A protein has these predicted regions:
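A short amphipathic helical element positioned immediately N-terminal to and/or at the very start
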Residues: 3-15, 203
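Hydrophobic alpha-helical transmembrane segments of multi-pass membrane transport/permease proteins
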Residues: 13-41, 49-69, 106-109, 165-171, ...
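Transmembrane helix boundary and interhelical loop/hinge segments in multi-pass membrane proteins
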Residues: 14, 65-89, 243
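Residue-level recognition of membrane-helix boundary sites in multi-pass small-molecule transporters
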Residues: 19-20, 93, 158, 189
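Transmembrane alpha-helix boundary and packing residues in multipass membrane permease domains
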Residues: 32, 36, 114, 118, ...
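Membrane-interfacial helix-loop-helix junctions in multi-pass membrane proteins
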Residues: 42, 46, 123, 174-228
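Alpha-helical transmembrane segments and their short interhelical loops
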Residues: 91, 95-168, 210-222, 227-230
Length: 243
């Protein structure tokens, strides 16, 4: 009950910043439109709408990292959170309270991307629903990573780290813009060791109905999601003790 009350407060706080929220929801759509236009003039298999849309939905989750990091960092710098530290809320309650309102936003962003892609030629099938459900583990990872960064860094720092560095890393290491096999070597190995490319490949597999292939990518995403969530809770608890 205490956790849900805090989650409700966080949801209201997120909605108080509609500009950043609209940017996070709208920017993936702009990319989808631009790359679809590029595909129409210079055909590239990677940018075909059925291949592109699943990747864009995964890339869009990087903005959830920025949202969650900024929310926690702002609260840490305010007197409100210091007062909340005196309540019976645990570190897990705080982390889940931040995460719960962001998950529907992440899923909403994914739904909007798929709906937006339909007029652009996206194949309509029940697999879209599976792809939306399948993106949840990666959404948890992105949100938890933001909570971890927000527990460590200040507001200005998370803007540069999560808004700039992480967004670019997730784009380059996910294989959305280019085939990682074309680069190969150490770069491809690093990408394979991280969850981004696995999330993109899983989304593509779910959308195409290849559930066997999708299952091969679930484990690394799940492990990263659990590990980062635990790290976020631990770091938040340390900050509570310091303050």
């Amino acid at each position: 009950m205490r956790m849900m009350t805090f989650a409700n407060r966080c949801a209201k706080e997120i909605l108080r910043d509609p500009i950043n929220l609209c940017f996070g929801l709208g920017f993936p759509l702009v990319l989808l439109l631009l790359l679809s236009a590029l595909q129409a003039n210079i055909p590239v298999s990677l940018f075909e709408i059925d291949m592109l849309t699943p990747g864009i939905t995964v890339f869009g989750l990087s903005f959830m990292t920025l949202f969650s990091a900024t929310l926690v960092a702002k609260d840490r710098e305010s007197a409100l959170l210091q007062r909340l530290y005196t309540t019976p809320l645990t570190g897990f309650d705080f982390i889940m309270g931040y995460m719960l309102p962001l998950l529907p936003i992440a899923l909403g962003q994914t739904v909007i991307c798929y709906l937006f892609a339909i007029p652009l030629g996206l194949t309509i099938s029940i697999n879209i629903v599976y792809a939306i459900i399948g993106i949840i583990p990666m959404a948890v990872f992105n949100i938890a990573l933001g909570l971890l960064c927000g527990s460590i860094f200040g507001v200005k720092q998370v803007g540069g780290i999560c808004g700039g560095l992480f967004t670019n890393l997730s784009a380059w290491l996910s294989g959305v813009w280019f085939d990682l096999k074309l680069v190969g070597g150490v770069f491809e190995k690093i990408a394979d060791a991280l969850p981004f490319v696995h999330a993109v490949e899983m989304e593509k597999a779910l959308f195409s109905g290849d559930f066997g292939l999708a299952a091969t990518h679930v484990l690394p995403i799940a492990l990263y999601s659990i590990a980062i969530t635990v790290m976020a809770v631990v770091c938040f608890l340390k900050q509570m003790k310091k303050q």
